[in-house]
Curated annotation (Swiss-Prot):
HAMAP family: RutF (MF_00833)
Protein name in UniProt: FMN reductase (NADH) RutF
Function: Catalyzes the reduction of FMN to FMNH2 which is used to reduce pyrimidine by RutA via the Rut pathway. In vitro, the flavin reductase Fre can substitute for the function of RutF, however, RutF is required for uracil utilization in vivo.
Family: Belongs to the non-flavoprotein flavin reductase family. RutF subfamily.
Swiss-Prot/TrEMBL GO biological process terms: nitrogen utilization; pyrimidine nucleobase catabolic process; uracil catabolic process
Catalytic activity: FMNH2 + NAD(+) = FMN + NADH + 2 H(+)
E.C. no: 1.5.1.42
PANTHER family: FLAVIN REDUCTASE (PTHR30466), FMN REDUCTASE (NADH) RUTF (PTHR30466:SF1)
Domain of life: Bacteria
InterPro entries named in the record: Flavin_Rdtase-like_dom, NADH-dep_flavin_reductase, RutF, Split_barrel_FMN-bd
Observed effect of gene inactivation: Cells lacking this gene fail to grow on uridine as the sole source of nitrogen at room temperature.
Length: 164
């Protein structure tokens, strides 16, 4: 059996462009957030998406206990916020760097996000070092910014909506 080594896998995955998201939660275990690109649609019936979260991450206990989250998809120009939520910055400083609303689940919803998906975690599957969080979408909020943001080849890239 051919086993792919970790670095080869990571290098190959860098070729897959993905939206940049800040995943947030709030509840009995407190407010927390992190940057993620491992987010995707599962089904539209019922509307469900998934988020992958490392069980060794400092935010894991909050998401595991709160069982709610908001996927805030970033737009171009929000790279500094992505970097802030992707580092070791204390939570209160992360959240102080942007304007937030409270979503229907009680999770922080980024006011300037391209789109926000407010969710309840409906199922968790553990694979290797990560939990795959299946999330039932309870509300969606869209913003009208024309520029998206993707992570590709280990750097940020802006995307522009085509003119209609």
């Amino acid at each position: 059996m051919n086993i792919v080594d970790q670095q080869t896998f990571r290098d190959a995955m860098s070729c897959m462009g993905a939206a940049v998201n800040i995943i947030t939660t709030d509840g009995p275990a407190g407010r927390a957030g992190f940057t993620a690109s491992a987010v995707c649609s599962v089904t539209d019936t019922p509307p469900t998406l998934l988020v992958c979260l490392n069980r060794g991450a400092s935010v894991w206990p909050a998401f595991n206990e709160n069982r709610t989250l908001c996927v805030n998809t970033l737009s171009a120009g929000q790279e500094p916020l992505s970097n802030l939520f992707g580092g070791k910055t204390p939570m209160e400083h992360r959240f102080a760097a942007a304007r937030w609303q409270t979503g229907v689940t009680g999770c922080p919803q980024l006011e300037e996000a391209l789109v926000s998906f407010d969710c309840r975690i409906s199922q968790v599957v553990s694979v290797g070092t990560h939990d795959i969080l299946f999330c039932a979408i309870e509300a969606i909020h869209r913003h009208t910014t024309p520029y998206g943001l993707v992570w590709f080849d280990r750097s940020y890239h802006a995307l522009m909506r085509p003119a209609c």
